[in-house]
Amino acid sequence: MTWLDDIRWDRDGLLPVIAQEAATGDVLMFAWMNREALARTAELGEAVYWSRSRGRLWHKGEESGHIQKVRDMRLDCDNDVLLLKVEQLGHEPSIACHTGRHSCFYQRYESGAWHAVELVLKDPEHIYR
């Protein structure tokens, strides 16, 4: 039995992951990991996720250069959600979202509608190679 066996993977073999900026506490994004992604993350010290849409491993920053250096990994009390405390690299200020924003959580509910409350820091057309 390994440390990976302590995790309660969902029926698809996935684990929900929250990426939080270590320095500020900002929640950057939500993603998924499978067993291989988590093992690679621990080995590399950089976030590697499972892309459900692409059906493959996704090393964060592989196309954009916006790599997430993992500073701490914490498993929740039920062993079924992972918190990654990361240093977001590749742009200053940091960009974690594919929309060119700091965080994927840039929409706020106000007065019956969703409103973008974070600026686009870099046009996504100039991010991806």
UniProtKB/Swiss-Prot annotation:
Enzyme class: hydrolase
EC number: 3.5.4.19
Highest taxon of the lineage: Bacteria
Pathway: Amino-acid biosynthesis; L-histidine biosynthesis; L-histidine from 5-phospho-alpha-D-ribose 1-diphosphate: step 3/9
Keyword Cytoplasm belongs to the record: yes
Functional summary from the UniProt entry: Catalyzes the hydrolysis of the adenine ring of phosphoribosyl-AMP.
Complexes and interactors: Homodimer.
Residues annotated to bind Mg(2+): D76, D78, D80
Pfam family, one: PRA-CH
Entry cofactors: Mg(2+); Zn(2+)
Family: Belongs to the PRA-CH family.
Binding site for Zn(2+): C77, C97, C104
Keyword Magnesium carried by entry: yes
Reaction equations catalysed: 1-(5-phospho-beta-D-ribosyl)-5'-AMP + H2O = 1-(5-phospho-beta-D-ribosyl)-5-[(5-phospho-beta-D-ribosylamino)methylideneamino]imidazole-4-carboxamide
Cofactor remark: Binds 1 Mg(2+) ion per subunit. Binds 1 zinc ion per subunit.
Keywords: Amino-acid biosynthesis, Cytoplasm, Histidine biosynthesis, Hydrolase, Magnesium, Metal-binding, Zinc
Gene Ontology CC: cytoplasm
Recorded coiled-coil stretches: none
UniProt name for this protein: Phosphoribosyl-AMP cyclohydrolase
GO MF entries: magnesium ion binding; phosphoribosyl-AMP cyclohydrolase activity; zinc ion binding
Compartments, as annotated in UniProt: Cytoplasm
GO BP, sorted A to Z: L-histidine biosynthetic process
